[in-house]
Amino acid sequence: MNIKIILLSIILIIQLLLLNNNGGIVESKINFSKRKQTDRKPNPSPKTYTKEYYDNKYLKSLKNVKQTPNDFLVTDLPGLDNGILTSFSGLLTTNETSDGNLFFWFFPANETVINPMDAPLLVWLNGGPGCSSMDSVFIETGPLRFIGDSDNSDKFYINPWSWHNSANMLYIDQPFGTGLSFVSDNDGLVTNDLEINQNFYQFIQEFFQIFSNYSTLPFFISGESYAGHYIPHMASYILNMNENLSKDSIKINLQGVAIGNGYTHPTTQINSYREFGYYATGIIGQRQYNNYENLNNLCQEQLSQGNYNSDECANVFNTLLDDSGSSNTSQVNMYDYRLNDPTAGNNWPLPGINQEFVYLNRDDVRSAIHATVTPHQWNECNDTVNGLLTNQDESSLYLFPELLSNIRVLIYNGQFDVICNHVGTTEYLNQIEWDYTQEWSDAPRFTWTSVGTDGSLQSGGYGKTAANLTFVLALGGSHMYPMNMPSTSFDMITRFLKNKSFNDLPQSIGIDAPSTPKPVPLTLGAWIGITVGGCAFGFLVGGLIIYIIMKKSSKNGYYKVIQ
């Protein structure tokens, strides 16, 4: 009994040290600090969008695209045996004027589950702005997971809940300067939505010219956080370019978009913080709640004047975080309010983030993924890219009526996210003026039965559907919902892509526990503890693993942890 207590105490101390490790700092997915102003051309107002807006002057002739898929085939990826996973990656030049290059990593659908030609093509974009979509490859929706917790871990197992089991997954680092994407000179970095849309559209055109077999498949765009701003603009741009298709251009078969914990309508979402903090979570009290009315009014005044980069709006969220702490506890983690963090989540050591940083900056890895020409090291987020986009608090909601008239839209929110919380999302969805406003208001709530990682049935969440719009409140989810709820998030995206009802049982649409077991990363049970929010289960399992390893590995008076 005493041995068990000592072991669990050791695990607890080590877990706390790991959770406060400063390595691999996670930068805010939405940076509410004061952003650097720029004298460069502003983002055009929606009222100034004209035909010229859709005349992509950067669009080069696709006849100049000479590469083939084999030029991008990933072979000998360090840490993964050949033949286990097929992927393609590299850089495409989408703006010849600035030598702007976007990095991508493409994972065709898993042939053991679905024929890639029978699956849709799904783009994934992380937010920031300026944060790399490679996070999703290694931590969220992608197939690669590091084994072990060492920063130098270079062995992978395949994520059994990877979204490439339902779709051909295309991860893009955008805009320029994000992740492994680059421009030759920082003057070529983008400053507005128009440039982002043009470069994204050009990228897809070139990608389909090279990977022509996929060009007619159903096309979807997904992402999280600030991608909730990107995606409506990109989808609207594609719809309009399809209507005015230029010579040699490929019509993109856009069928839908999926936005997770998106920053889409700041006017409402910022205003929701006090309701969420007081009524939905209880992380602030009555006194703080009363103080927010004045803070919100100051922010709304700035937004009404077209100032989408104000201290007043940043102050609303920062005050919420400050008020969530006390003299005895740290403030809550902005991405998961079950956790406390002195930096509110900015230093949250996501499982795999340190390994990702080391791995993507290795020369042999850069060579394998065809990114040796990228002149800078990979970082999760780029503050320069973030600072040049000064319209981050501008709404994208006005685009939704057009989108909902043409494509399907899935909006989902992790239950425990603060920064892009479900209260704000629910409120802005109710503000959309479209042909089915009344049907949306009257739509009954559904209770979604999903599948757990062990194959058992569990509640996935709640939501509602009317016409082309679906909203899901994902139980157990954080800001990075696919990270900590892999099975239910896979169930969710599969239903959306197949256009299946959330009222159906998962087995009825072919979703079951995968047959491939997930190996257990063995370093002190830390990954388990972090993934489930530091609960006692992680400590107990971690302690059991340590005890077994110590029993088997004791030699010459010391213990060694074996992976």
UniProtKB/Swiss-Prot annotation:
InterPro entries given in the database record: AB_hydrolase_fold, Peptidase_S10, Ser_caboxypep_ser_AS
Localization of this protein: Membrane
Residues in the signal sequence: 1-23
Catalytic site: 225, 417, 479
Designated name of the protein: Serine carboxypeptidase S10 family member 2
GO terms, molecular function: serine-type carboxypeptidase activity
EC number(s) recorded for this UniProt protein: 3.4.16.-
Keywords: Carboxypeptidase, Glycoprotein, Hydrolase, Membrane, Protease, Signal, Transmembrane, Transmembrane helix, Zymogen
EC class (word): hydrolase
Protein's organism: Dictyostelium discoideum (Social amoeba)
Pfam families in the cross-refs: Peptidase_S10
UniProt family annotation: Belongs to the peptidase S10 family.
